[in-house]
Amino acid sequence: MLQPKRTKFRKVMTGRNRGLAKGTEVSFGEFGLKAVGRGRLTARQIEAARRAMTRHVKRQGQIWIRVFPDKPITEKPLEVRQGKGKGNVEYWVAQIQPGKVMYEMNGVPEELAREAFRLAARKLPIKTTFVTKQVM
């Protein structure tokens, strides 16, 4: 599972997920999976989508993951009264804005990449679209 090796602070405030994304172009591979909606991806969701793609292309080609879960999410245990401080870190998320290219793929035919990204998109909680590299 993806998570930072070390952080400056253990816990962060919730905050908001506004604005537009950086990393909106396909830069490493030939094809990409781009976010249309906004939301947050857990490390488990990122890994599940990666596995779905890898299995479908039968480990040919190359896959890049362009998102990293760097925000800790805390939860208090069940049946615990409110107060007594912030809960423990339970999982890590990556905040996704519209336009962010989340995964890229290279070295496979377009139809195979399309199907692999479709399977991966089923594992993710946000709407996505298939994009190709723009050649100038």
Curated annotation (Swiss-Prot):
What NCBIfam families is this protein classified in?
Answer: rplP_bact
> What is the annotated role of this protein in its UniProt record?
Binds 23S rRNA and is also seen to make contacts with the A and possibly P site tRNAs.
Where are the coiled-coil regions?
none
Tell me the PANTHER family matching this sequence.
50S/60S RIBOSOMAL PROTEIN L16, LARGE RIBOSOMAL SUBUNIT PROTEIN UL16M
Give the InterPro entries listed for this entry. Answer: Ribosomal_uL16, Ribosomal_uL16_bact-type, Ribosomal_uL16_CS, Ribosomal_uL16_dom, Ribosomal_uL16_sf
Describe its assembly: Part of the 50S ribosomal subunit.
Q: Which family does it belong to?
A: Belongs to the universal ribosomal protein uL16 family.
Q: What is this protein called?
A: Large ribosomal subunit protein uL16
Q: Name one Pfam family in it.
A: Ribosomal_L16
Which GO cellular component does the record give, naming just one?
cytosolic large ribosomal subunit
Single GO MF descriptor: rRNA binding
Q: Which organism is it from?
A: Aliivibrio salmonicida (strain LFI1238) (Vibrio salmonicida (strain LFI1238))
Q: Does the keyword Kinase apply?
A: no
Report keywords, A-Z.
Ribonucleoprotein, Ribosomal protein, RNA-binding, rRNA-binding, tRNA-binding
Listed GO biological process terms = translation
Write down the PROSITE patterns for this protein, in alphabetical order. RIBOSOMAL_L16_1 (PS00586)
